[in-house]
Amino acid sequence: MIELSGRLLCETAGDTALVSALLPEHIALTRAEPGCLRFDVQQTADPLVWSVFEQFRSRTDFEAHQMRVKASSWGLRTAHIKRDYTVTEKA
């Protein structure tokens, strides 16, 4: 199993509005992917910071997710927003 955890770090209220607008579709598409066990993104007490937690069944599933995201509206339109993620492999 692959887990990703960390934060999405917006710099402006405009970035936060963009994340809020695009996030529902991004969550729905990700949760429908083969191998997605869990996908949670939530705004923290700081409105510019979002907590992210993902679990995928295998590295192959996780890598397929990463490829889809890069080409998606979410990936293209939020590429400028800083990510602070840790990826770990669990038995």
Residue ranges and their predicted role:
Residues L9-L18:
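Short, surface-exposed ligand-recognition loops at beta-strand->loop->(often short) alpha-helix junctions
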